[in-house]
Regions:
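Covalent nucleotidyltransferase
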Residues: 19, 30-116
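Cleaved targeting-peptide boundary
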Residues: 17-23
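Sec-dependent signal peptide recognition
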Residues: 1-9
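Short boundary/loop segments of OB/S1/cold-shock single-stranded nucleic-acid-binding domains
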Residues: 25-27
């Protein structure tokens, strides 16, 4: 029974922690002057949040990225989209769930925010 309580604690603490990151989400801008802003195309990939040590999903769950993939990531938080090419969302999602490191070479983390 203790094991069940412990697992529930881990589950809910991860969800709470994920919400604390306050990720930037898509929104519509109306009547705002966007002159001077930098904008990019919406990439159809998988959200990737690097906290300085671990690559996490939008939900705050660790992604099984191999060491070579994150070796050059900075020691601070970056937020972006794991992407390979258009119309490949299913493959991208599959790779981000896979422990097969060779497939990760197809992906790039396109950074769009540096929180804090």
């Amino acid at each position: 029974m203790r094991a069940i309580y412990f697992l529930l604690y881990l589950l809910f603490s991860q969800i709470t922690w994920a919400n604390e990151r306050d990720l930037m989400l898509l929104s519509t801008y109306e009547n705002q002057d966007v002159q001077g802003w930098v904008m990019s195309e919406k990439l159809d990939g998988v959200r990737g949040y690097w906290d300085g040590k671990t690559l996490l999903s939008r939900q705050g769950l660790p992604l099984p990225a191999p060491t070579y993939f994150t070796a050059q990531f900075p020691p601070f938080a970056i937020d972006g989209e794991l992407f390979s090419e258009r119309n490949q969302f299913e493959e991208i999602a599959s790779i981000t769930k896979s422990f097969k490191g060779d497939n990760w070479a197809k992906l790039t983390l396109y950074v769009f925010d540096v929180p804090n």
